[in-house]
Amino acid sequence: MLQPKRTKFRKAHKGRIHGNAPGGASLNFGAFGLKALEPDRITARQIEAARRAITRHIKRQGRLWIRIFPDVPVSSKPAEVRMGSGKGSPEFWAARVKPGRILFELDGVPGPLARVAFERAMEKLPIKTKVVARFGESIYEDK
């Protein structure tokens, strides 16, 4: 799973996610992408589950880019522990995602295959997302 090699601080504030993504909102690498429509934290496990769903569906053809990285430590206290006594220990890593952010990109696969692969990944993520394509590319069957 993804996590930083080293960080400046062990624990982070919870914070709130305001506004839309200032950067990372356009396709930079692939022809198809998965774009976030809601703000939320996405954990390293969720990113890995989505990555596996995509790679298993495209059967290792094409190229996949993960455009988000879990760089925020999320801490929690153990169950049935009284309030106080400081902040809990870091439990997992998460990425803060704003609406409009591209989460994954795919290239080298047909549009319909990319769409189905991204739909499999959508089920693994806690936010609403949509499939986007470069100008001139189609994610639907030609009829």
Swiss-Prot record:
UniProt keywords, alphabetically: Ribonucleoprotein, Ribosomal protein, RNA-binding, rRNA-binding, tRNA-binding
Any one Gene Ontology molecular-function term assigned to this protein's record: tRNA binding
Superkingdom classification of source: Bacteria
Transmembrane segments: none
Start-end of Basic residues biased regions: 1-17
Entry GO terms, CC: cytosolic large ribosomal subunit
Region (Disordered): 1-21
Entry-linked InterPro entries: Ribosomal_uL16, Ribosomal_uL16_bact-type, Ribosomal_uL16_CS, Ribosomal_uL16_dom, Ribosomal_uL16_sf
Annotated PROSITE patterns: RIBOSOMAL_L16_1, RIBOSOMAL_L16_2
One GO process term, biological-process aspect: translation
CDD domains from the UniProt entry: Ribosomal_L16_L10e
Name of a matching Pfam family: Ribosomal_L16
Keyword hit for rRNA-binding: yes
Assembly behavior: Part of the 50S ribosomal subunit.
Record's function text: Binds 23S rRNA and is also seen to make contacts with the A and possibly P site tRNAs.
Family, per entry: Belongs to the universal ribosomal protein uL16 family.
Name this polypeptide is given: Large ribosomal subunit protein uL16
Annotated source species: Rhizorhabdus wittichii (strain DSM 6014 / CCUG 31198 / JCM 15750 / NBRC 105917 / EY 4224 / RW1)
Encoding gene per record: rplP
